[in-house]
């Protein structure tokens, strides 16, 4: 008996939508739907269809109805059926899809061939084997409670490993109970200003633009503090009477590259003590110093006045969403209260893997390898500039994964356009300047040297030198 069978649609196969509607018997409707799915390309050639029983259960049909529909489509050549391989879409069942000829676009700059943007590590150097080994060990050793709800601070194994590592390598004074694991620097900043701290916040006049966007989204007003070759001009903080928090990159000021002078480190801590304020220490590029030992963390001068924030986004990969905050005692509970309400916790397996990776010494070995690799990259950049553009000065090259190339006044925008035509993705210095900064504007390029693959790095440097203004 014919019937109108509508408002019925289900999923079959590999997430392909099968629409069962229209007049006719259930067998006829199913045959038509399968034929249309093959004809339109929804069911690709050689796709294996579900067994009769499974599809019948999914669609609320009799098994014989599905079997008859399959048999009919096999006879028509839409499907094939073989013992042991099930029922599949015939390889020549569907007509070829029409090829769309794109309209010719107007001539423009080429797509970037070389990525020289800052802030990105060498993805090809991720220690896959060592990370996999650490993950297997960590998973085998994980206690049952690791697969439960967990501690909002993060796994104790990782917090203990971080406390030991940070004390040894960065001079951080802490214990595991004052470390809160999060999923990176940006989530840490959201937590702190999502209900724990209030603005206005002093920031460096040149800094990461996404920090400012994130803070603006949280309705936090930022006040710029000048920077020079020695980091932030901390003496300017006293002029901002309402400011109770300052965000700094003391290990390697971003983007200018200068480490904060020892006397300025002491000065900012004295300011925080006198005003009852806090220093947020972004340990940007703290692991990658080439010409001498990495400078110690400001947090070591006063753990009750400094929030130390770090992550593995540069040392390992931004794909591993792990970071940490080392908090003063009085902030631990407020941060945990906000974290429990607002932020998804970092993955337990990644936490356990990183703990093993640190404890086994694999993290130290990886960092030593990467320091040498990035030092070599830096040296090739400075050598290319010395040979082909000696009038261009590179600054901030003692640490980190980028350099600032100082350009003649008024040439930044034209150089960026030339770089685009050379197939380069690179940032201008103006992008990182605070809108209310009062320090003089400077023209420059912020050139990352961590990302290009080895085989293409020479070509990237050639393209960069061609884009620079003549001397």
Identify the role of each PLM range.
Residues 1-138, 147, 336, 340-346, ...:
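N-terminal basic, amphipathic alpha-helical segments
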Residues 119-121, 250-254, 314, 452:
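Short glycine-rich anion-binding loops that position phosphate/pyrophosphate groups of nucleotides
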Residues 135, 145-275, 287-289, 293-301, ...:
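Conserved core of the PLP fold type I
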Residues 221, 278, 424-425:
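Residue-level detector of anion-binding/catalytic polar loops
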């Amino acid at each position: 008996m014919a019937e109108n069978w509508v408002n019925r649609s289900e999923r079959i196969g590999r997430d392909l939508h099968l629409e069962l509607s229209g007049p006719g018997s259930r067998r006829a409707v199913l045959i038509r739907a399968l034929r249309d799915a093959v004809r339109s390309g929804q069911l690709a050639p050689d796709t294996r269809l579900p067994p009769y029983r499974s599809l019948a259960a999914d669609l609320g049909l009799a098994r014989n109805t599905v079997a008859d529909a399959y048999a009919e489509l096999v006879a028509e050549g839409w499907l094939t059926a073989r013992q042991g391989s099930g029922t599949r879409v015939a390889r020549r069942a569907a007509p070829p899809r029409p090829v769309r000829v794109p309209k010719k676009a107007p001539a423009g700059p080429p797509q970037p061939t070389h990525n020289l943007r800052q802030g990105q590590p060498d993805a090809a150097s991720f220690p896959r084997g060592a990370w996999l080994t650490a993950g297997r060990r960590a998973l085998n050793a994980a206690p049952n409670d690791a697969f439960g709800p967990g501690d909002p601070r993060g796994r104790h194994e990782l917090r203990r490993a971080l406390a030991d590592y940070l004390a040894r390598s960065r001079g951080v004074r802490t214990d595991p109970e004052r470390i809160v694991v999060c999923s990176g620097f940006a989530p840490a900043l959201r937590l702190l200003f999502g209900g724990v701290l209030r603005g206005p916040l002093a920031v460096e006049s040149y800094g990461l633009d996404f920090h400012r966007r994130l803070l603006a989204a949280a309705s936090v007003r930022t006040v710029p503090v000048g920077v020079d070759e020695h980091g932030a001009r901390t003496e300017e903080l006293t002029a901002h009477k309402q400011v109770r928090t300052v965000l700094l990159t003391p290990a390697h000021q971003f983007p200018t590259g200068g480490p904060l002078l020892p006397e300025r480190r002491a000065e900012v801590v004295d300011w925080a003590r006198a005003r009852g304020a806090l220093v947020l220490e972004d340990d940007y590029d703290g692991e990658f110093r080439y010409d001498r030992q990495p400078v110690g963390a400001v947090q070591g001068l006063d753990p009750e006045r400094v929030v130390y924030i770090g992550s593995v986004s540069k040392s390992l990969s931004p794909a591993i969403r792990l970071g940490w905050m080392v908090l003063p005692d009085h902030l631990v509970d407020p941060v945990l209260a906000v974290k429990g309400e607002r932020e998804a916790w970092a993955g337990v397996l990644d936490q356990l893997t990183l703990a093993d990776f640190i404890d086994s010494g694999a993290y130290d070995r990886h960092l030593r390898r990467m320091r040498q690799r990035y030092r070599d990259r830096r040296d090739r950049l400075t050598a290319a500039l010395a040979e082909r553009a000696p009038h261009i000065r590179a600054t901030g090259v003692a640490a980190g994964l980028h350099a600032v190339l100082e350009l003649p006044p008024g040439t930044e925008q034209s150089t960026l356009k030339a770089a685009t035509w050379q197939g380069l993705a690179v940032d201008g210095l103006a992008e990182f300047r605070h809108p209310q900064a009062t320090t003089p504007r400077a023209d420059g390029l912020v050139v990352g040297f961590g990302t290009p693959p080895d085989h293409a790095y020479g070509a990237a440097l050639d393209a960069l030198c061609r884009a620079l203004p003549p001397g």
